[in-house]
Amino acid sequence: MAKKVTGVVKLQLPAGKATPAPPVGPALGGYGINIMAFVKEYNEKTASQAGSIIPVEVTIYSDRSFTITLKTPPAADLLRKAAGIEKGSGTPNRKIAGTITAKQLRQVAEQKMSDLNAQSIEAAEKIIAGTARSMGIKIVE
């Protein structure tokens, strides 16, 4: 018989640097799982992606066991790295925070494709372009 799911928790944590301190401890503590076991497993799985923020989905079962599903970094994080900027524009349509090329946009879209609700790479590019626009990042040819 399959294990009964008691909860699903979504977190965005720095790769390889998760600690039992907030936000991890309070989010998972209520389900009674071993927080140190989660932190150790997450850090092992994400050690190669240091410097990125990696979203994780923790499925918690009734026997207090859990499974970890890693996602791709947020589109905004990937776009900031591609544009080489610290943060997006406070006024996106007025002030340009940075620029990326169409090739860089395609690379970000390909990386995010598995997490996006898009059927083709062109549709994924449009989604990522919208995120870039709302951050004040201009796309140049």
Swiss-Prot record:
One example of a Gene Ontology biological process annotation: translation
GO CC aspect terms: cytosolic large ribosomal subunit
UniProt-listed Pfam families: Ribosomal_L11 (PF00298), Ribosomal_L11_N (PF03946)
Stated name of the protein: Large ribosomal subunit protein uL11
Alphabetized GO MF terms: large ribosomal subunit rRNA binding; structural constituent of ribosome
Record-stated family: Belongs to the universal ribosomal protein uL11 family.
Subunit structure: Part of the ribosomal stalk of the 50S ribosomal subunit. Interacts with L10 and the large rRNA to form the base of the stalk. L10 forms an elongated spine to which L12 dimers bind in a sequential fashion forming a multimeric L10(L12)X complex.
Ribonucleoprotein recorded as keyword: yes
Function: Forms part of the ribosomal stalk which helps the ribosome interact with GTP-bound translation factors.
InterPro entries: Ribosomal_uL11, Ribosomal_uL11_bac-typ, Ribosomal_uL11_C, Ribosomal_uL11_C_sf, Ribosomal_uL11_CS, Ribosomal_uL11_N, Ribosomal_uL11_N_sf
UniProt organism field: Roseiflexus castenholzii (strain DSM 13941 / HLO8)
Keywords, ordered alphabetically: Methylation, Ribonucleoprotein, Ribosomal protein, RNA-binding, rRNA-binding
